[in-house]
Amino acid sequence: MSHASRPTPLEARGSTPLTGRVRVPGDKSISHRALILGALAVGETKITGLLEGEDVLNTAKAMAALGAKVERVGEGAWRVHGVGVGGFRAPDAPLDFGNSGTGCRLAMGAVAGSPIAATFDGDASLRSRPMRRILDPLELMGAKVSGGDGARLPLTLEGARDPIPMVYRTPVASAQIKSAVLLAGLSAPGETTVIEAEASRDHTERMLAQFGADIVTEPEGTHGRRITLTGQPELHGADVVVPADPSSAAFPIVAALIVPGSDLTLTDVMTNPLRTGLFTTLREMGASIEESDVRDAGEPMANLRVRASKLRGVTVPPERAPAMIDEYLVLAVAAAFAEGTTRMLGLKELRVKESDRLEATADMLRVNGVKVEIVGDDLIVHGEGRVPGGGTVATHMDHRIAMSALVMGCASDTPVKVDDTAFIATSFPDFIPMMRGLGADFV
């Protein structure tokens, strides 16, 4: 499995003002989907700006193992020659997704609609994460699961020879569940419908339409959506421009807000409203984040200018969670530097990420002198405008914990140590050198 090497510790010290103009890596969600839909399409898909982190590269390897031709033609530039819907071949070896839950779960959906069997595996972290809520709807569509106690990796998924279209209500707001069902539904005759009570990120729906699928999205209730896909289309290769990842941009954004004197511009950041809950919350806290050059290239994007700001505590409503589920860790850092109490409500989903991120976030803050409490599934941070620091943060093989802790150390009174930064490579390989280039002191 990945990351068998020794831990790579690092210490973040008080930073000089962060200044400059940078582009963070391409969006991870879009990168995974571009590779998978490219593999399911007929003809050539051209991808520019692909995130070349370990998670996405594992998805590229998996698509090649399933029969697609996947090639890198330049930095962030890739070509995929697809096999068409239902055209996957059985791989010769297990598909190893390393640390990537997204790549693994979306690929399960694609395989579930194909008449082949494939074994899915990953690193120790991914093996510990639950898969049952992805597998439940896929089994209803005709796929069969064996091994892995039926819920965890490694497991073997045998795709349905005649996938069954269905109407499925997602048990939680999860783009991964929704996407897996839609990808399996590509091979089913008739209509496959997914109903979600709370809208989750809609990258799969947008990209399916771009590749030629017949897909319709309608409102459902107060905050939900009903997505209907007509199966057995012929998807056609497309040109995909991958915008900068807002989840990666979150780290330099928060760093710039908390380091006095900072003035930082991030270019081409995706501003899809189902991904920008963090930006909304930070602005409510008093953050100076200005958009310019707003445009659309399949996904909305803009340049963001971020200046150091005095932040105040706020309450983050639970319905915002789907639009910022990966950003609560670094939001908690911002909350620690804010004046007053920040309440982040309804964070149950953080418990089933790369680690139990709810407990890990609280631990990260506590060991650095921040007053924090967990009440049920709510995280409550009592900000005092400063963070003492001085602690060592256990990352639990989680890239976002590592980056959040390093951001905290940029502005804490004393340095913050991180026990292992190796897993940052899964999503943001150049994070450390990029931050150093902006003025961060990581040693």
Swiss-Prot record:
The gene is aroA. It is an enzyme of class 2 (transferase). GO terms for biological process: amino acid biosynthetic process; aromatic amino acid family biosynthetic process; chorismate biosynthetic process. Pathway: Metabolic intermediate biosynthesis; chorismate biosynthesis; chorismate from D-erythrose 4-phosphate and phosphoenolpyruvate: step 6/7. Monomer. GO terms for molecular function: 3-phosphoshikimate 1-carboxyvinyltransferase activity. 3-phosphoshikimate binds at K28, S29, R33, S174, Q176, D326, K353. Gene3D superfamilies: Enolpyruvate transferase domain (3.65.10.10). Phosphoenolpyruvate binds at K28, G101, R129, Q176, R357, R400. It comes from Afipia carboxidovorans (strain ATCC 49405 / DSM 1227 / KCTC 32145 / OM5) (Oligotropha carboxidovorans). GO terms for cellular component: cytoplasm. The active site is at D326 (proton acceptor). It catalyses: 3-phosphoshikimate + phosphoenolpyruvate = 5-O-(1-carboxyvinyl)-3-phosphoshikimate + phosphate. This is 3-phosphoshikimate 1-carboxyvinyltransferase. It is found in: Cytoplasm. Catalyzes the transfer of the enolpyruvyl moiety of phosphoenolpyruvate (PEP) to the 5-hydroxyl of shikimate-3-phosphate (S3P) to produce enolpyruvyl shikimate-3-phosphate and inorganic phosphate. Keywords: Amino-acid biosynthesis, Aromatic amino acid biosynthesis, Cytoplasm, Transferase. Pfam families: EPSP_synthase (PF00275).
